[in-house]
Protein backbone atom coordinates (compact mmCIF):
# COMPACT_ATOMS: atom_id res chain seq x y z
CA UNK A 1 0.00 0.00 0.00
CA UNK A 2 0.99 3.64 -0.50
CA UNK A 3 2.53 5.54 2.39
CA UNK A 4 3.88 9.02 3.17
CA UNK A 5 6.58 9.36 5.84
CA UNK A 6 6.89 12.63 7.76
CA UNK A 7 10.04 13.15 9.78
CA UNK A 8 10.09 15.82 12.47
CA UNK A 9 12.59 16.96 15.06
CA UNK A 10 11.44 14.44 17.69
CA UNK A 11 9.20 11.91 15.90
CA UNK A 12 8.32 10.29 12.59
CA UNK A 13 4.71 9.84 11.44
CA UNK A 14 3.52 7.31 8.86
CA UNK A 15 0.50 8.31 6.76
CA UNK A 16 -1.20 5.44 4.94
CA UNK A 17 -2.19 7.45 1.87
CA UNK A 18 -0.78 7.93 -1.65
CA UNK A 19 -1.20 11.73 -1.54
CA UNK A 20 -1.20 14.22 1.32
CA UNK A 21 -2.42 17.82 1.12
CA UNK A 22 0.04 20.49 2.26
CA UNK A 23 -2.13 21.71 5.16
CA UNK A 24 -2.40 18.21 6.66
CA UNK A 25 1.33 17.62 6.15
CA UNK A 26 2.13 20.86 8.02
CA UNK A 27 -0.15 19.88 10.93
CA UNK A 28 1.41 16.41 11.26
CA UNK A 29 4.92 17.89 10.94
CA UNK A 30 4.12 20.30 13.78
CA UNK A 31 3.23 17.39 16.11
CA UNK A 32 6.43 15.55 15.14
CA UNK A 33 8.44 18.70 15.93
CA UNK A 34 7.37 18.84 19.62
CA UNK A 35 9.63 17.10 22.13
CA UNK A 36 6.56 16.51 24.36
CA UNK A 37 5.34 13.92 21.82
CA UNK A 38 8.68 12.15 21.30
CA UNK A 39 8.15 8.40 21.63
CA UNK A 40 4.44 8.54 20.69
CA UNK A 41 3.58 6.19 17.81
CA UNK A 42 1.84 8.34 15.19
CA UNK A 43 -0.07 6.59 12.39
CA UNK A 44 -2.38 8.56 10.10
CA UNK A 45 -5.30 6.90 8.30
CA UNK A 46 -6.08 6.96 4.53
CA UNK A 47 -9.00 9.40 5.00
CA UNK A 48 -6.55 12.05 6.22
CA UNK A 49 -7.32 15.75 5.73
CA UNK A 50 -6.54 18.96 7.59
CA UNK A 51 -8.95 19.83 10.39
CA UNK A 52 -9.37 22.66 12.85
CA UNK A 53 -6.24 22.57 15.00
CA UNK A 54 -5.39 18.97 14.14
CA UNK A 55 -5.40 16.42 11.35
CA UNK A 56 -8.47 14.25 10.78
CA UNK A 57 -7.33 10.62 10.56
CA UNK A 58 -4.74 10.89 13.34
CA UNK A 59 -3.99 8.01 15.71
CA UNK A 60 -1.24 8.22 18.32
CA UNK A 61 -0.21 6.48 21.50
CA UNK A 62 -0.25 8.73 24.57
CA UNK A 63 1.31 8.61 28.02
CA UNK A 64 1.11 11.52 30.45
CA UNK A 65 0.12 14.40 28.16
CA UNK A 66 -2.98 14.98 26.01
CA UNK A 67 -3.90 17.80 23.64
CA UNK A 68 -7.70 18.18 24.12
CA UNK A 69 -7.85 19.91 20.74
CA UNK A 70 -6.58 16.76 19.05
CA UNK A 71 -9.59 14.79 20.23
CA UNK A 72 -11.60 17.85 19.20
CA UNK A 73 -14.96 19.31 20.14
CA UNK A 74 -17.19 16.40 19.06
CA UNK A 75 -15.95 13.98 21.73
CA UNK A 76 -17.27 10.44 21.22
CA UNK A 77 -18.73 11.12 17.78
CA UNK A 78 -19.49 7.92 15.91
CA UNK A 79 -22.05 5.57 14.39
CA UNK A 80 -24.66 3.25 15.84
CA UNK A 81 -25.41 0.47 13.34
CA UNK A 82 -28.57 -1.60 13.81
CA UNK A 83 -29.48 -4.60 11.66
CA UNK A 84 -33.27 -4.87 11.29
CA UNK A 85 -35.45 -7.93 10.80
CA UNK A 86 -37.73 -6.00 8.42
CA UNK A 87 -36.99 -6.01 4.67
CA UNK A 88 -39.20 -3.04 3.73
CA UNK A 89 -39.77 0.36 5.39
CA UNK A 90 -42.18 3.20 4.58
CA UNK A 91 -39.59 5.94 3.99
CA UNK A 92 -42.12 8.75 3.74
CA UNK A 93 -43.42 7.83 7.19
CA UNK A 94 -39.86 7.47 8.53
CA UNK A 95 -38.88 10.90 7.20
CA UNK A 96 -41.95 12.49 8.80
CA UNK A 97 -41.18 10.74 12.12
CA UNK A 98 -37.56 11.97 12.14
CA UNK A 99 -38.54 15.55 11.31
CA UNK A 100 -41.17 15.53 14.07
CA UNK A 101 -39.40 13.56 16.84
CA UNK A 102 -35.63 14.07 16.37
CA UNK A 103 -34.24 17.61 16.71
CA UNK A 104 -31.57 18.43 14.12
CA UNK A 105 -29.26 21.34 13.33
CA UNK A 106 -28.91 23.34 16.56
CA UNK A 107 -32.22 22.19 18.05
CA UNK A 108 -32.61 20.10 21.23
CA UNK A 109 -35.53 18.13 22.69
CA UNK A 110 -38.36 19.76 24.66
CA UNK A 111 -38.58 16.76 26.98
CA UNK A 112 -35.67 14.84 28.45
CA UNK A 113 -35.25 11.32 26.97
CA UNK A 114 -35.42 8.40 29.43
CA UNK A 115 -31.80 7.40 28.68
CA UNK A 116 -30.65 10.44 30.69
CA UNK A 117 -31.17 8.23 33.75
CA UNK A 118 -28.04 6.26 32.74
CA UNK A 119 -25.79 9.28 33.10
CA UNK A 120 -25.09 11.84 35.83
CA UNK A 121 -23.52 14.86 34.16
CA UNK A 122 -23.10 16.63 37.50
CA UNK A 123 -20.18 14.19 37.98
CA UNK A 124 -18.19 16.10 35.33
CA UNK A 125 -15.14 17.78 36.88
CA UNK A 126 -15.99 20.80 34.71
CA UNK A 127 -19.76 20.65 35.43
CA UNK A 128 -19.87 24.34 36.37
CA UNK A 129 -18.62 25.19 32.84
CA UNK A 130 -21.43 23.26 31.14
CA UNK A 131 -25.07 24.05 30.38
CA UNK A 132 -26.39 20.86 32.00
CA UNK A 133 -30.03 21.52 31.13
CA UNK A 134 -29.26 21.91 27.43
CA UNK A 135 -27.00 18.84 27.54
CA UNK A 136 -29.73 16.68 29.06
CA UNK A 137 -32.20 17.82 26.39
CA UNK A 138 -29.60 17.06 23.70
CA UNK A 139 -29.70 13.28 24.25
CA UNK A 140 -31.71 12.16 21.22
CA UNK A 141 -30.72 15.03 18.88
CA UNK A 142 -28.83 14.73 15.59
CA UNK A 143 -26.95 17.99 15.06
CA UNK A 144 -25.75 19.16 11.64
CA UNK A 145 -22.65 18.95 9.44
CA UNK A 146 -21.79 15.39 8.44
CA UNK A 147 -24.18 13.79 10.94
CA UNK A 148 -26.87 11.64 9.39
CA UNK A 149 -29.59 9.03 9.79
CA UNK A 150 -29.55 6.42 7.06
CA UNK A 151 -31.18 3.15 6.08
CA UNK A 152 -28.88 0.90 4.04
CA UNK A 153 -29.51 -2.35 2.21
CA UNK A 154 -27.09 -5.28 2.02
CA UNK A 155 -26.70 -7.40 -1.14
CA UNK A 156 -29.08 -10.04 0.28
CA UNK A 157 -31.80 -7.50 1.10
CA UNK A 158 -31.21 -7.08 4.86
CA UNK A 159 -31.75 -3.53 6.11
CA UNK A 160 -29.52 -1.54 8.47
CA UNK A 161 -30.31 1.64 10.36
CA UNK A 162 -27.21 3.83 10.80
CA UNK A 163 -27.14 6.90 13.06
CA UNK A 164 -24.07 9.17 12.97
CA UNK A 165 -23.88 11.81 15.70
CA UNK A 166 -21.79 12.85 18.69
CA UNK A 167 -21.77 14.74 21.97
CA UNK A 168 -23.47 17.84 20.57
CA UNK A 169 -22.70 21.13 22.40
CA UNK A 170 -21.56 19.31 25.54
CA UNK A 171 -18.45 18.05 23.73
CA UNK A 172 -17.61 21.58 22.62
CA UNK A 173 -17.94 22.92 26.17
CA UNK A 174 -15.76 20.17 27.65
CA UNK A 175 -13.10 20.39 24.91
CA UNK A 176 -12.86 24.18 25.03
CA UNK A 177 -12.62 24.24 28.83
CA UNK A 178 -9.68 21.81 28.92
CA UNK A 179 -7.93 23.36 25.92
CA UNK A 180 -8.11 26.76 27.66
CA UNK A 181 -6.96 25.24 30.96
CA UNK A 182 -4.03 23.62 29.17
CA UNK A 183 -3.00 26.95 27.68
CA UNK A 184 -3.40 28.67 31.03
CA UNK A 185 -1.32 26.03 32.80
CA UNK A 186 1.43 26.21 30.18
CA UNK A 187 1.57 29.95 29.61
CA UNK A 188 -0.78 31.87 31.86
CA UNK A 189 1.39 31.49 34.95
CA UNK A 190 4.55 32.12 32.96
CA UNK A 191 3.35 35.44 31.56
CA UNK A 192 2.09 36.49 34.96
CA UNK A 193 5.35 35.48 36.64
CA UNK A 194 7.46 37.33 34.07
CA UNK A 195 5.42 40.51 34.48
CA UNK A 196 5.58 40.32 38.30
CA UNK A 197 9.35 39.75 38.18
CA UNK A 198 9.89 42.74 35.86
CA UNK A 199 7.81 44.98 38.15
CA UNK A 200 9.78 43.83 41.18
CA UNK A 201 13.17 44.35 39.50
CA UNK A 202 12.15 47.81 38.32
CA UNK A 203 11.11 48.70 41.87
CA UNK A 204 14.50 47.51 43.09
CA UNK A 205 16.32 49.45 40.37
CA UNK A 206 17.88 46.30 38.82
CA UNK A 207 17.26 47.43 35.23
CA UNK A 208 20.40 45.85 33.72
CA UNK A 209 19.36 42.35 34.87
CA UNK A 210 15.81 42.45 33.48
CA UNK A 211 16.46 41.13 29.94
CA UNK A 212 18.65 38.26 31.14
CA UNK A 213 16.01 37.25 33.72
CA UNK A 214 13.18 37.34 31.13
CA UNK A 215 15.19 35.07 28.78
CA UNK A 216 15.85 32.60 31.60
CA UNK A 217 12.17 32.53 32.67
CA UNK A 218 10.97 31.99 29.10
CA UNK A 219 13.38 29.09 28.70
CA UNK A 220 12.21 27.63 32.00
CA UNK A 221 8.54 27.76 30.95
CA UNK A 222 9.16 26.77 27.31
CA UNK A 223 6.69 29.02 25.49
CA UNK A 224 7.57 27.51 22.12
CA UNK A 225 4.77 24.94 21.71
CA UNK A 226 2.06 26.01 19.18
CA UNK A 227 -1.23 27.23 20.64
CA UNK A 228 -3.19 24.41 18.95
CA UNK A 229 -0.98 21.83 20.67
CA UNK A 230 -1.42 23.09 24.23
CA UNK A 231 -1.59 19.95 26.35
CA UNK A 232 -2.88 18.95 29.78
CA UNK A 233 -0.85 16.89 32.24
CA UNK A 234 -0.95 15.88 35.90
CA UNK A 235 -4.29 16.51 37.66
CA UNK A 236 -5.70 18.23 34.54
CA UNK A 237 -4.87 15.11 32.50
CA UNK A 238 -6.81 12.94 34.98
CA UNK A 239 -9.78 15.34 35.00
CA UNK A 240 -9.85 15.50 31.21
CA UNK A 241 -9.80 11.70 30.84
CA UNK A 242 -12.63 11.43 33.40
CA UNK A 243 -14.77 14.05 31.65
CA UNK A 244 -13.96 12.74 28.17
CA UNK A 245 -15.20 9.26 29.15
CA UNK A 246 -18.45 10.70 30.55
CA UNK A 247 -18.91 12.78 27.38
CA UNK A 248 -18.19 9.70 25.28
CA UNK A 249 -20.93 7.83 27.15
CA UNK A 250 -23.24 10.81 26.55
CA UNK A 251 -22.58 10.51 22.78
CA UNK A 252 -23.37 6.77 22.82
CA UNK A 253 -26.64 7.43 24.68
CA UNK A 254 -27.49 10.24 22.27
CA UNK A 255 -27.31 7.85 19.31
CA UNK A 256 -29.15 5.08 21.18
CA UNK A 257 -31.94 7.53 22.05
CA UNK A 258 -32.44 8.35 18.36
CA UNK A 259 -32.42 4.65 17.50
CA UNK A 260 -35.04 4.11 20.22
CA UNK A 261 -37.27 6.89 18.83
CA UNK A 262 -37.07 5.39 15.32
CA UNK A 263 -37.52 1.72 16.28
CA UNK A 264 -40.47 2.39 18.59
CA UNK A 265 -42.05 5.02 16.31
CA UNK A 266 -41.85 2.77 13.25
CA UNK A 267 -42.40 -0.56 15.04
CA UNK A 268 -39.08 -1.97 13.80
CA UNK A 269 -37.22 -4.97 15.26
CA UNK A 270 -33.45 -4.93 15.89
CA UNK A 271 -31.51 -8.14 15.17
CA UNK A 272 -27.97 -6.95 15.87
CA UNK A 273 -26.32 -3.67 16.92
CA UNK A 274 -22.78 -2.30 17.22
CA UNK A 275 -21.08 1.04 17.93
CA UNK A 276 -18.13 2.59 16.07
CA UNK A 277 -16.53 5.69 17.68
CA UNK A 278 -14.07 8.02 15.99
CA UNK A 279 -13.13 11.02 18.21
CA UNK A 280 -11.84 9.76 21.53
CA UNK A 281 -9.06 8.24 23.59
CA UNK A 282 -9.10 4.46 23.97
CA UNK A 283 -7.99 4.42 27.62
CA UNK A 284 -7.42 0.63 27.63
CA UNK A 285 -4.69 0.89 24.99
CA UNK A 286 -3.97 4.62 25.57
CA UNK A 287 -4.46 5.46 21.89
CA UNK A 288 -5.90 8.78 20.72
CA UNK A 289 -8.12 8.50 17.66
CA UNK A 290 -9.24 11.63 15.82
CA UNK A 291 -11.35 10.79 12.81
CA UNK A 292 -10.27 7.16 13.03
CA UNK A 293 -11.80 4.04 14.54
CA UNK A 294 -10.69 1.04 16.57
CA UNK A 295 -9.88 -2.07 14.51
CA UNK A 296 -8.81 -4.65 17.09
CA UNK A 297 -8.68 -8.30 15.99
CA UNK A 298 -12.22 -9.49 15.20
CA UNK A 299 -13.80 -6.15 16.13
CA UNK A 300 -16.82 -5.19 14.00
CA UNK A 301 -16.67 -1.66 12.62
CA UNK A 302 -18.42 0.59 10.12
CA UNK A 303 -16.70 2.86 7.60
CA UNK A 304 -19.27 5.20 6.00
CA UNK A 305 -18.14 6.50 2.59
CA UNK A 306 -20.76 9.04 1.44
CA UNK A 307 -24.50 9.65 0.92
CA UNK A 308 -24.51 7.76 -2.40
CA UNK A 309 -22.12 4.84 -1.88
CA UNK A 310 -23.09 3.83 1.66
CA UNK A 311 -20.80 2.06 4.09
CA UNK A 312 -18.40 -0.83 4.55
CA UNK A 313 -18.99 -3.25 7.42
CA UNK A 314 -15.55 -4.53 8.36
CA UNK A 315 -13.74 -6.74 10.84
CA UNK A 316 -10.56 -5.42 12.45
CA UNK A 317 -7.24 -7.25 12.09
CA UNK A 318 -5.55 -5.86 15.22
CA UNK A 319 -2.57 -4.52 13.28
CA UNK A 320 -0.26 -2.88 15.85
CA UNK A 321 1.58 -1.01 13.13
CA UNK A 322 -1.68 0.83 12.37
CA UNK A 323 -2.29 1.43 16.11
CA UNK A 324 -5.13 -1.14 15.72
CA UNK A 325 -7.05 1.56 13.86
CA UNK A 326 -8.94 2.12 10.59
CA UNK A 327 -10.28 5.17 8.72
CA UNK A 328 -13.60 6.62 9.91
CA UNK A 329 -14.83 7.38 6.40
CA UNK A 330 -13.62 8.30 2.93
CA UNK A 331 -12.21 11.65 3.98
CA UNK A 332 -13.02 15.00 2.41
CA UNK A 333 -11.69 15.75 -1.07
CA UNK A 334 -12.44 19.46 -0.73
CA UNK A 335 -13.27 21.84 2.11
CA UNK A 336 -16.89 22.75 2.81
CA UNK A 337 -16.32 26.23 1.36
CA UNK A 338 -14.70 24.81 -1.79
CA UNK A 339 -17.59 22.33 -2.19
CA UNK A 340 -20.20 25.12 -2.08
CA UNK A 341 -18.21 27.03 -4.72
CA UNK A 342 -17.26 24.18 -7.05
CA UNK A 343 -20.19 21.74 -7.02
CA UNK A 344 -23.63 21.97 -8.61
CA UNK A 345 -27.08 21.01 -7.34
CA UNK A 346 -27.82 19.33 -10.69
CA UNK A 347 -24.94 16.92 -10.20
CA UNK A 348 -25.88 16.37 -6.53
CA UNK A 349 -29.47 15.47 -7.50
CA UNK A 350 -28.28 13.15 -10.28
CA UNK A 351 -25.84 11.31 -7.97
CA UNK A 352 -28.57 10.72 -5.36
CA UNK A 353 -31.16 9.26 -7.77
CA UNK A 354 -32.81 6.12 -6.40
CA UNK A 355 -32.24 7.05 -2.74
CA UNK A 356 -35.20 8.36 -0.74
CA UNK A 357 -34.13 11.71 0.71
CA UNK A 358 -35.63 15.13 1.36
CA UNK A 359 -32.18 16.53 2.15
CA UNK A 360 -30.67 17.11 -1.29
CA UNK A 361 -30.81 20.90 -0.91
CA UNK A 362 -28.28 23.73 -1.46
CA UNK A 363 -27.43 23.77 2.27
CA UNK A 364 -26.14 20.16 2.19
CA UNK A 365 -24.12 20.51 -1.04
CA UNK A 366 -20.91 20.39 1.04
CA UNK A 367 -21.91 16.86 2.09
CA UNK A 368 -22.58 15.58 -1.44
CA UNK A 369 -20.75 12.45 -2.67
CA UNK A 370 -18.53 14.58 -4.94
CA UNK A 371 -17.00 16.36 -1.89
CA UNK A 372 -15.45 13.10 -0.64
CA UNK A 373 -12.64 10.78 -1.74
CA UNK A 374 -13.78 7.69 -3.67
CA UNK A 375 -14.58 4.34 -2.08
CA UNK A 376 -11.90 2.74 -4.29
CA UNK A 377 -9.17 4.88 -2.69
CA UNK A 378 -10.11 3.69 0.81
CA UNK A 379 -10.61 0.03 -0.17
CA UNK A 380 -7.16 0.02 -1.82
CA UNK A 381 -5.50 1.12 1.43
CA UNK A 382 -7.24 -0.68 4.33
CA UNK A 383 -6.19 -4.30 3.63
CA UNK A 384 -3.53 -4.46 6.37
CA UNK A 385 -5.89 -3.24 9.12
CA UNK A 386 -9.43 -4.37 8.26
CA UNK A 387 -11.26 -7.03 6.28
CA UNK A 388 -14.39 -5.94 4.41
CA UNK A 389 -17.31 -8.20 5.39
CA UNK A 390 -19.93 -6.51 3.23
CA UNK A 391 -20.97 -3.25 1.64
CA UNK A 392 -24.34 -1.72 2.46
CA UNK A 393 -25.93 0.85 0.14
CA UNK A 394 -28.24 3.76 1.09
CA UNK A 395 -31.94 3.50 0.34
CA UNK A 396 -32.89 6.37 2.70
CA UNK A 397 -30.86 9.35 3.91
CA UNK A 398 -31.53 12.22 6.31
CA UNK A 399 -28.92 14.90 6.83
CA UNK A 400 -29.40 18.35 8.34
CA UNK A 401 -27.55 21.47 7.31
CA UNK A 402 -25.74 23.28 10.12
Which stretches of residues belong to each language-model region?
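Domain-length cofactor-binding catalytic modules of enzymes
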Residues: 2-30, 37-44, 50-56, 65-68, ...
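Acidic active-site catalytic centers that drive phospho-/nucleotidyl reactions
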Residues: 46-47, 74
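Glycine-rich phosphate/pyrophosphate-binding loop regions near the starts of catalytic domains
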Residues: 59-60
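A generic, well-ordered mixed alpha/beta core segment in the N-terminal half of proteins
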Residues: 68-124
